[in-house]
Amino acid sequence: MECSESLELVDKFACGHILSRMFNVVMKHSICDLLEDGPKHYSEISKIIGFKDDSYCYRLMRYFVPRKLFKESVVQVGVFSKTPFSTEFSNNGTLKKLAKFHCNSFHYKLSQVLPETLEIGENQGPSSIGLSDYWEQIEKNEIYKNEFNDGMIGYTTHILKFLKGKIDLSKFETVVDIGGSHGYLIGSLLDRYPNVNGINFDTDMVINSSNEKYQHPRLKHVAGDFFKSVPEADCYLMKLILRCFSDEKCCELLKIISKSMKSNAKIIILDIILDSSKYLNFDTYLDILMMETLDGKQRSLSEWIKLFEMSGFKIDKYESGSPNYLIISKE
């Protein structure tokens, strides 16, 4: 291995904290959007975003050139242009809100006690910064709550592109999106199925505080506690919900849903299926994030099967790809 290649390994495995912080600045100032209408000199970018010293902006932009986020002109040094990557993180792409959420400062603070969490075998994240749990951050920090909501919208927008043709809701009368936040997922799906009615079901705090609730004539926003009861329906959606909880809590939730399910009802779970033959970086990252924020976890297919068997369900269909999903029904 060449010397330069060896040092690239150091960057890849030891310097991620710098990457996260640098990218946070890029997203905070929407720099990817600034390049969408054409190349710009770093001094112009610096002026737009309000840096006091242009040279610091140059070093920020240059840092991301070998990472293929930006391109620097070889003819006009200091002039930067967009790449396919940067477009994805602009308003013309689908990843801006999701990326901005994941690189925020709160997540960075939680990561500082990851070694303790791993060594002790118990979540140390929220308590390390004086929180009783992760949800307290959403309740008390308006900025983070908005970034959380935006992040969920961003993820939903991204997967909606790939869901078409994967799942079919046409045979159902009522579909409930459990933990649906703003209702963007179920609301968007209703546009595809004119005979389906939708219910967006989430906590009172979420339902009555979201400024971006999806409006649709066949969609109701209902507040409640899904660990107590859920609305009756013949189909339920759960997007990235079960990963937030332990197996025991997931069993509890599934059994509560079971009580309200109509005959032949289905539950559609949009969540990661970890595959040891093709682990993806983002999937394993999310597993660690769940561990550090909620004591949750991502699951392999065998873990999903075990969870469903414990809860009185069976898998009717699943796909491990993009996106991952499982369709289950009562045994």
Curated annotation (Swiss-Prot):
Any GO MF annotation of the entry: S-adenosylmethionine-dependent methyltransferase activity
Biological process, per Gene Ontology: biosynthetic process; methylation
UniProt: S-adenosyl-L-methionine binding residues: G179, D202, G224, D225, F226, K239
InterPro entries: COMT-like, O_MeTrfase_dom, SAM-dependent_MTases_sf, WH-like_DNA-bd_sf, WH_DNA-bd_sf
UniProt keyword Methyltransferase, yes or no: yes
Signal peptide: none
The EC number(s) this enzyme carries: 2.1.1.-
Keyword annotations of the record: Methyltransferase, S-adenosyl-L-methionine, Transferase
Family annotation (Pfam families): Methyltransf_2
Similarity field: Belongs to the class I-like SAM-binding methyltransferase superfamily. Cation-independent O-methyltransferase family. COMT subfamily.
Protein name as annotated: Probable inactive O-methyltransferase 11
Upper classification of the organism: Eukaryota, Amoebozoa, Evosea, Eumycetozoa, Dictyostelia
